[in-house]
Amino acid sequence: MASSQGKNELKFADWMATLPESIHSIPLTNLAIPGSHDSFSFYIDEASPVGPEQPETVQNFVSVFGTVAKKLMRKWLATQTMNFTGQLGAGIRYFDLRISTKPRDPDNELYFAHGLFSAKVNEGLEEINAFLTDHHKELVFLDFNHFYGMQKYHHEKLVQMLKDIYGNKMCPAIFAQEVSLKYLWEKDYQVLVFYHSPVALEVPFLWPGQMMPAPWANTTDPEKLIQFLQASITERRKKGSFFISQVVLTPKASTVVKGVASGLRETITERALPAMMQWVRTQKPGESGINIVTADFVELGDFISTVIKLNYVFEEGEANT
């Protein structure tokens, strides 16, 4: 029997648990799942050094202007305002994670990083795990897609960290089309870890990065972004992987200079939001439709509820399969 929890009465912290029963056996590759871009960037440590992936021009800029430069960088690097717990409670289930070592760090810790450093990785993963323990029918996609300054032993440390924190909650890598809510619930799995490194081939619970493609438009133009998103979905492989639609605009250097004091949210994201949300509303999930949809500042424009509600086309018999 279908859940009595209607799409207009969503409980975002438990939205997967309350999906209609008719959706439980559909592969997760065919569902619409909201995610966040640079998920960890709600916290950026302005006291930290610049990330090792930053070009020399940025390094020089910070060395000359110091804290002022970092404060300006933060306005353009922070793409989220909610922490992991807040994002999860609001319905986010995919996390875009970028990991780095920190130069001259005596503790040799691993950090989330994008331009500047964020929180320690173990703290973020523990925060996500606490939510999963309290919401045992919800699941998350952890996508480790960039690694900076990491040697073999750093990867080994991260793999062990995942084991220690998530243990039997992690679903081993299998054929993606076999993974449904019903399958995961029966086995008490709640975590799918995607790892964009050859290390993934050596560890059963790491899904290879190519099973989570995320085409990047790299544009500040909402119209070009939408054209790119639509073309990417059209070219999506019919089977075999998950798929990310990044509803994200990327600032050029000239854009940053013009809006240097206002930042990403005010200069780009909020202005383009109506056009981007209109595109999301017109989509359908399915083999040749959307799957995971990511955005900056996920609390804006009913983004999360809009993506979740797309799943109800399955109940209405209109799925794009």
UniProtKB/Swiss-Prot annotation:
Q: What are the GO MF terms of this UniProt record?
A: phosphoric diester hydrolase activity
List the PROSITE patterns hit by this protein, alphabetically. PIPLC_X_DOMAIN
What is any Pfam family matched here?
A: PI-PLC-X
- In the UniProt entry, which residues are flagged as the active site? H37, H114
**Where in the numbering of this chain does the PI-PLC X-box domain appear?**
22-197
InterPro entries per the record?
Answer: PI-PLC_domain (IPR051057), PLC-like_Pdiesterase_TIM-brl (IPR017946), PLCXD1/2/3 (IPR042158), PLipase_C_PInositol-sp_X_dom (IPR000909)
User: Per its UniProt record, what SMART domains does this chain match?
Assistant: PLCXc
Q: Which domain of life is it from?
A: Eukaryota
What cellular-component terms does GO give this entry? synapse
From its record, what is one biological process in GO terms?
A: lipid catabolic process
Which PANTHER family does the entry link to? PI-PLC X DOMAIN-CONTAINING PROTEIN 3, PTHR13593
* Full protein name: PI-PLC X domain-containing protein 3
What lineage does UniProt assign to this protein's organism?
Eukaryota, Metazoa, Chordata, Craniata, Vertebrata
The primary gene name is: PLCXD3
